[in-house]
């Protein structure tokens, strides 16, 4: 109970600041400026006495939707005063919208209300606040002992507001409203403000539990006499519920809200929400390498103190002792020998071959011999068979031989002469002449 109590103290201070501003500006024309806490039907906030009594009373369906209106900005409340509060079931006269002539009465009533709030803060006890909250509660919404709703819920509740009352509210006649809202004399402003509140709000009793909706009185009460003693009305009170239960009722009123606790993303990223990537845990450790036990591939470190043998070779220069050296052929042993060839004398004597030399065949002896074959002569005689040839048979033709040797005499020779009586003259027969020429030519080719 300590935490809701602290919230109500803050809300009382907030409401007191609004009323003091209204008290300072009460002389202004009420038609030009309307405070966000102008009428009881326009604003959900109440005097500190009514707030404390409502904090102790049972939260109903009206209380569940009340923070969505009360905790808004004053500019939003002023903009949504006339169209938002009419569906609550209150009459136009109670809301202060129907008659423009009632604005002055309402402004005067609010000035007295602000002054009564300051007096209640100074001297009145909690009993007076309780009864005032119980008597003067119209069909408006009171702040519940819950914290301020988030802006998302505020806009949602303003958009989808549901009338909380199920039974129609009784309308007061215009005559009674004028009688109740007549401005009293200046001396009795405080009593008139208290009586006006109780008269306007006496048509409603304090909301009971949800199970007893018939406990509300629907008959408007007459204006109370101007006395300071508050009128006590029996109030059925139940222990206040936890904020979680009220929050569940608040969510059930505008409509079913989606269950956002079981929502999963498409790729299941909420399941791995606490997962940290392994790349961030990689530590680059800089360790010095221990090279004391490192061995080379070829084992060169084992032989690091080895001195190569080539470097230890010393070139010693020793003079060669040639005293005992002997040649291969023993020339030094015979170094003093003189060759005998040097003493040989070449003598040249002219030989007399003619006197001593004889030929093998004794040619010189027979030098004057004349061979006998030298006296023989080879005679060559030309055979003249053609010239002397005769035909075996005497056919009466004269054979004319023409020698192949060109001679000056081109006339054919008559080989034979036939008697004039039976002879054939070659001149007279040219065919025989050509035949004889052909035969002689063929014989000449054969070499005959």
Curated annotation (Swiss-Prot):
Residues carrying N6-methyllysine: 266
Gene Ontology CC: axon; cytoplasm; cytosol; dendrite; extracellular region; microtubule; plasma membrane
Domain of life: Eukaryota
Position(s), cross-link Glycyl lysine isopeptide (Lys-Gly) (interchain with G-Cter in ubiquitin): 33, 261, 266, 274, 288, 305, 318, 324, 328, 338, 350, 354, 360, 376, 382, 392
Inducing or repressing factors: During neurite outgrowth.
Role according to the record: Promotes microtubule assembly and stability, and might be involved in the establishment and maintenance of neuronal polarity. The C-terminus binds axonal microtubules while the N-terminus binds neural plasma membrane components, suggesting that tau functions as a linker protein between both. Axonal polarity is predetermined by tau localization (in the neuronal cell) in the domain of the cell body defined by the centrosome. The short isoforms allow plasticity of the cytoskeleton whereas the longer isoforms may preferentially play a role in its stabilization.
Domain notes: The tau/MAP repeat binds to tubulin. Type I isoforms contain 3 repeats while type II isoforms contain 4 repeats.
Name used for this protein in its record: Microtubule-associated protein tau
Organism the protein comes from: Bos taurus
